[in-house]
């Protein structure tokens, strides 16, 4: 029988914090592309100074790899948006397994949810399905509808071939790396008006 092409199929592993080493099931869903352990390790090293007590928003939660990792590292809370019903149900089960009472799963299309007036978050994860043109629309909805706190950090994962995404003028590129065909970047937001105060 042919083995899967990638190891760890069907589960994610939390790599740091209070739930370090815990493995959690992930449904087999087309297009589900959990952020790799290596990329997550780099990202959460970047976020280490600010993750504790942060309010986090995971716009395309999928496996929950980013939101659950943030909670494991003592984020104050997390909202995980996931459109696929089966995937969102598994996220709810995984949160219950971890006894994570400081998180909620929103079973919704991210664009529809983010089009509403939001509450400010300190850290936002934007890791949309590739090749669907969702990235820049998501970025604009976050900025325009109040989802971002002053000085929020926004993690963006995208295809290398697309180059730098267009971001609001008050976002600055803080960190950037490439892993294979995936570019991952961390942006820092300034409150509107601060960048004009020089």
Swiss-Prot record:
Coiled-coil residue spans: none
Domain of life: Bacteria
GO BP annotations listed: rRNA base methylation
Pfam families, sorted: Cons_hypoth95
Signal peptide annotation: none
EC number: 2.1.1.171
UniProt KW DNA repair keyword: no
SUPFAM superfamilies: S-adenosyl-L-methionine-dependent methyltransferases
The reaction(s) this protein catalyses: guanosine(966) in 16S rRNA + S-adenosyl-L-methionine = N(2)-methylguanosine(966) in 16S rRNA + S-adenosyl-L-homocysteine + H(+)
Matches recorded under CDD domains: AdoMet_MTases
InterPro entries: DNA_methylase_N6_adenine_CS, RNA_MeTrfase_RsmD, SAM-dependent_MTases_sf
GO terms for MF: 16S rRNA (guanine(966)-N(2))-methyltransferase activity; nucleic acid binding
Keywords: Methyltransferase, rRNA processing, S-adenosyl-L-methionine, Transferase
Top class in the EC scheme: transferase
Function according to Swiss-Prot or TrEMBL: Specifically methylates the guanine in position 966 of 16S rRNA in the assembled 30S particle.
Family classification: Belongs to the methyltransferase superfamily. RsmD family.
Entry protein name: Ribosomal RNA small subunit methyltransferase D
Species in which this protein is naturally found: Escherichia coli (strain K12)
């Amino acid at each position: 029988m042919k083995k899967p092409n990638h190891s760890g199929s069907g589960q994610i592993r939390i790599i740091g914090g209070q739930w370090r080493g815990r493995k959690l099931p992930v449904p087999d869903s087309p297009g589900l592309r959990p952020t790799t352990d290596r990329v997550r390790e780099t990202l959460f090293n970047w976020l280490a100074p600010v993750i504790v007590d942060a309010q986090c928003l995971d716009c395309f939660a999928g496996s929950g790899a980013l939101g659950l990792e943030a909670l494991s590292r003592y984020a104050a809370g997390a909202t995980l948006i996931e459109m696929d019903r089966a995937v969102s149900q598994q996220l709810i089960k995984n949160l219950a397994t971890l006894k994570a009472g400081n998180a909620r799963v929103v079973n919704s299309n991210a664009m529809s949810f983010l089009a509403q007036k939001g509450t400010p978050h300190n850290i936002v994860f934007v890791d949309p399905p590739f090749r669907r043109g969702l990235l820049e629309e998501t970025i604009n909805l976050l900025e325009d509808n109040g989802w971002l706190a002053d000085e929020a950090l926004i993690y963006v994962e995208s295809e290398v071939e697309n180059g730098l995404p267009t971001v609001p003028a008050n976002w600055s590129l803080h960190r950037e790396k490439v892993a294979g065909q995936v570019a991952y970047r961390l942006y820092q937001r300034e409150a509107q008006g601060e960048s004009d105060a020089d």
